[in-house]
Regions:
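Periplasmic peptidoglycan-binding/tethering modules of Gram-negative envelope proteins
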Residues: 1-83, 155-164
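Periplasmic OmpA-like peptidoglycan-binding domain that tethers envelope proteins to the cell wall
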Residues: 59-62, 87-164
Length: 164
């Protein structure tokens, strides 16, 4: 989503899952199952950067969420029941436990910005941190590309109407 505009992001998030949805799942089932999460498209917020050990972003990075927020607003106008999963990730520096907490905080930071700055209703956002479990770059080093947030539209997995 680094330089994608709202129409590109909308088109991407609005695509059906990459495999057929077999049944309706709970949000907790989606959060726990990488197979389920991998069945929907992932949108990395490429312009967001987190410092090592930090869950905050600088004020000038808030704008990097505008195309994602605009696409979400458009989808919510069409279907107020849309649900988006905000995933937080860390690099491999630090303990597993501290990275899980940090990744949760990163996901929550992005969800809060989407709600506070872009008026995305909090009830349409679900957050989950995965720590260092899903490294983008396989390294134990402090790799900035691993300190990221991913947005997924999980509505087709949790809603009968959208799974048809």
């Amino acid at each position: 989503a680094a330089s994608a505009d709202e129409a590109d992001v909308y088109g991407f998030l609005n695509q059906p899952p990459v495999e057929q949805v077999r049944r309706i799942y709970t949000i907790d089932e989606v959060k726990r199952s990488s197979r389920l999460r991998d069945s929907v498209r992932r949108l990395e917020i490429g312009d967001l950067t987190f410092d090592t050990g930090k869950a905050t972003i600088s004020r000038n990075q808030v704008g990097s969420l505008s195309s994602v927020a605009d696409a979400m607003q458009k989808m919510l106008q069409r279907n107020p029941g849309e649900v988006f999963l905000i995933e937080g990730h860390t690099d491999a520096v630090g303990s597993d436990v501290s990275n899980l907490v940090l990744s949760d905080q990163r996901a929550s930071t992005v969800a809060r910005i989407l709600s506070d700055f872009y008026d995305i209703p909090p009830e349409n956002l679900v957050t989950q941190g995965y720590g260092e479990r899903y490294l983008k770059v396989k390294t134990e080093a402090a790799e900035p590309l691993n300190r990221r947030v991913v947005v997924k539209r999980i509505t087709p997995l949790i809603s009968y109407a959208s799974a048809k």
